[in-house]
Regions:
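Helix-breaking motifs and short loop linkers at transmembrane-helix boundaries and internal kinks
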Residues: 9, 41, 62-67, 230, ...
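Conserved MFS/SLC helix-loop-helix module at the cytosolic interface between two early adjacent transmembrane helices
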Residues: 28-67
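Helix-to-loop junctions at the C-terminal end of transmembrane segments
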Residues: 29-41, 251-263, 348
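Cytoplasmic helix-loop-helix junction between adjacent transmembrane helices
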Residues: 72-106
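Symmetry-related core transmembrane helices of the 12-TM Major Facilitator Superfamily/SLC fold
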Residues: 130-151, 355-373
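A late C-terminal transmembrane helix in Major Facilitator Superfamily
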Residues: 316-353
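Extracytoplasmic gate region of multi-pass secondary transporters
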Residues: 197-241, 245-249
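C-terminal transmembrane helical hairpin of 12-TM major facilitator-type secondary transporters
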Residues: 261-309
Length: 384
């Protein structure tokens, strides 16, 4: 970002404006996902959304000024929110929980790969513009793959799901046969319609809390280690990356664990691991071992929560309502990710950064309360 700032003649602090525009776009497109998917289908929405991100990234690479970056941040945000909502709901309906976990593990791998691609471009003397260009080329290739695969999207039938037990073979065959039937036409659910559904508020607050916890840990872990624990800044940044590694590795592993346990159990196991990680962070172990190990355990605990909450949504609320609810989940995720880390920044500045673990606990406790309330209201039955 410092290199871009010098080339574009814009202060580094203005990067926050780009992030705000992207976040606003993701929220808008996530809220529109039910309407768009009903009209065009999940495959087309996903392909168009990825194409928008490819266009935006190529635009970033050609941007001569800060304001052009702002302009291309709009399609980037719209595309990111669209693909998140449409693809997550499609996978939740048509695939099993381990597929969802591995899908989100790929997000972690992508998030770790992106900086390396940018670093390669900078080290090769090609500049930051080529870093964005390389990534845009990958997105263009992905768009082409999605377009050619559109006929395959129509061939999938919904996976029979149950929160409590595995379905019998007869139920599986019946559900598969029903999945081939044409879905009856309906009006898209608006925000009020979603909020009126029993249990929807709980699952939305869960998502807000999870993403607030994850993003706060991701953005403030290194500062907590450096300023709160006295660890060298370079070392702190290295150890803080264990959180992201924990999430990615955890999702790869939890994909196998979901073959044994259902989604609510996976969510509870993740919550217990997050709590255990925070407790370890607070232990006065030598060489800051508690902070380092605890942070990685928190990452491992976060791993199954996000994908399992999404995958359980059609089971709780029905496939006819899940797209609208998943879209709202994505919107809540972006709001939590965008708003809550800065709130902790104010706490760190005006009180103390030592409160970092306790800040995570607040969101964890609220998440647990909402999950148990959701289970009491909806149980293992679909809400009609």
């Amino acid at each position: 970002m410092a290199t871009m700032s010098a080339d574009l003649g814009a202060p580094v602090s203005w990067a926050g404006g780009i992030s705000m525009v992207i976040s606003a776009g993701t929220i808008v497109s996530a809220l529109m996902s039910d309407r768009m998917t009903l009209r065009f289908g999940a495959g087309k929405v996903t392909a168009i959304s990825v194409a928008l991100t490819a266009l935006a990234l190529f635009g970033f690479s050609m941007a001569p000024s800060y304001w052009v970056l702002i302009l291309f941040a709009v399609p980037y945000g719209l595309g990111a929110g669209g693909v998140d909502a449409a693809l997550n709901n499609y996978v939740a309906i048509h695939y099993e929980s381990h597929h969802m976990s591995w899908l989100h593990a790929m997000w972690g791998i992508g998030a770790l790969t992106g900086p390396y691609i940018m670093g390669y471009a900078l080290n090769a003397g090609q500049g930051w513009s080529w870093g964005y260009r390389y990534i845009s080329i990958l997105q263009i290739v992905l768009t082409a793959i999605l377009i050619f695969s559109l006929p395959l999207w129509k061939q999938r039938v919904p996976q029979p799901q149950s929160i409590e037990t595995e379905p019998s073979a007869d139920i599986t065959e019946q559900s598969a046969a029903e999945g081939l039937a044409q879905e009856p036409s309906r009006e898209p659910l608006g925000i009020r319609g979603v909020l009126a559904i029993r249990g929807a508020r709980e699952i939305l607050i869960m998502f807000f809390c999870y993403c607030a916890l994850e993003q706060t840990a991701m953005l403030w872990a290194s500062s907590y280690m450096a300023l709160g624990k006295g660890i060298d800044k370079t070392t702190a940044a290295m150890w803080a990356s264990l959180f992201c590694i924990g999430i990615t590795v955890g999702r790869l592993l939890s994909g196998f664990v979901t073959m044994k346990f259902n989604d609510p159990t996976m969510i509870r196991m993740g919550q217990v691991l997050v709590l255990l990680g925070v407790v370890v962070m607070l232990l006065p172990l030598p060489q800051h071992l508690g902070t380092i190990v605890g942070l990685m355990v928190v990452g491992l605990g976060c791993a199954p929560i996000y994908p399992c909450v999404i995958h359980s949504t059609p089971t709780y609320f029905g496939e006819d309502k899940s797209q609208a609810i998943v879209g709202m989940q994505m919107a809540c995720a972006y709001v939590g990710s965008m708003c809550m880390p800065p709130v902790f920044g104010l706490i760190a500045q005006h009180v103390t950064i030592i409160l970092f673990p306790w800040y995570l606990v607040v969101f964890l406790v609220l998440m647990i309360v909402m999950h148990e309330s959701l289970r009491r209201k909806c149980g293992g039955q679909r809400i009609g």
